[in-house]
Amino acid sequence: MKALRNYLDKIKPNFEEGGKFHAFRSVFDGFETFLFVPNATSKSGTHIHDSIDSKRIMSMVVIALVPALLFGMYNVGYQHFHATGAAGGFWEMFIYGFLAVLPKIIVSYVVGLGIEFVVAQWKKEEIQEGFLVSGILIPMIVPVDCPLWILAVATAFSVIFAKEVFGGTGMNVFNVALITRAFLFFAYPTKMSGDAVWVSGDSIFGLGQSVDGLTVATPLGAAATSGAVPEFSWDMVTGLIPGSIGETSVIAIALGAILLLWTGIASWKTMFSVFVGGAFMAWVFNAIGPDTPMAQMPWYEHLVLGGFCFGAVFMATDPVTSARTETGKYIFGFLIGAMAIIIRVLNPGCPEGMMLAILLMNIFAPLIDYCVVQGNISRREKRAIKSNN
């Protein structure tokens, strides 16, 4: 790393004022601060000194996503070999999944970072780090058969209209990755739902077997269409079920959650409240809900199926788009969990529910914080008046 530091110091004058690459200073600054903590000194103002900056925080989130991503790659291969009947061992399945998922990661980063580079150059600012996380989240929350060109269009839409128009990193109202999924869901519904998108039917570089018209339903999709409550299986916990690339394994997601909670990056209040809200609403529907598979599904199945765990750990805890007051985090998380189950039960056309629940609560997060703050002010005023009397 010292050699790299010396090399960057050597070429840095070329990117400063008067240098021959001055036009690309924002690109150089973004790359430099990604690798090393900035050594710039503030001229005025009060600042908090810490050994970690936002890029380091984003890097920790990406590390927390790695277990779910790696398992997702394996599961993509496992589901393909299992559905097509092709012969293959662990490494064949993992390599197949790796080759299927890698292009989506590349497209996500190339399109998203490309737009951020252009915006940074236009605004003459340093490249912002927020897409470091969004770029890996996007391919993890889509089906494996999502076409690359559609993913590119959706990524561009979300970066421009859900992030840059609001001012960039830290200013967005909605979770960028979920806006990508929402755009895909409403603009290209056949590529995001049904039984033909969750398992790849193609052979990749000789691995696997090509099968036309391969259809495999997710447990939630089967419950919404078959009229039967899916029987609980440990595959629902380990993640060996059809679904979006990175959302199926509760164990892998839990490993990421432990890291986020241990480092203090994610709020346990928000995360815990999402599960409480989901379990409570599932229990309510079990008790008084309609006689449908979604309404009668046990609360623990609701929590481990679909994107519930992934959304609770990596989406609801987004510090930019979630509630920021301590009490507000409980309310915000609880309402997300409850709303996700309500959408699942009452809207057969959307058996997932988590995406819409989080985006809806992103809208209400500022209002929740406002009500909490005003409530605290009101209580303190009453205590002050009472003590003066």
Segments and roles (model prediction):
Residues 1-105, 389:
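N-terminal signal-anchor module of multipass membrane proteins
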Residues 42-48, 112-123, 160-170, 255-263, ...:
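C-terminal ends of transmembrane helices
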Residues 94-108, 145-154, 236-250, 295-308:
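Structural signature of hydrophobic alpha-helical transmembrane segments
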Residues 111-116, 131-140, 155-162, 252-260, ...:
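Hydrophobic, membrane-inserted alpha-helices
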Residues 126-207:
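Membrane-interface helix-loop-helix junctions at boundaries between adjacent transmembrane segments
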Residues 170-254:
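Long hydrophobic alpha-helical segments that form multi-pass transmembrane helix bundles
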Residues 173-178, 300-306, 329, 348-361:
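Loop-to-transmembrane alpha-helix initiation sites
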Residues 271-326:
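A beta-strand-loop signature enriched in Asp, Gly, Thr, and Trp
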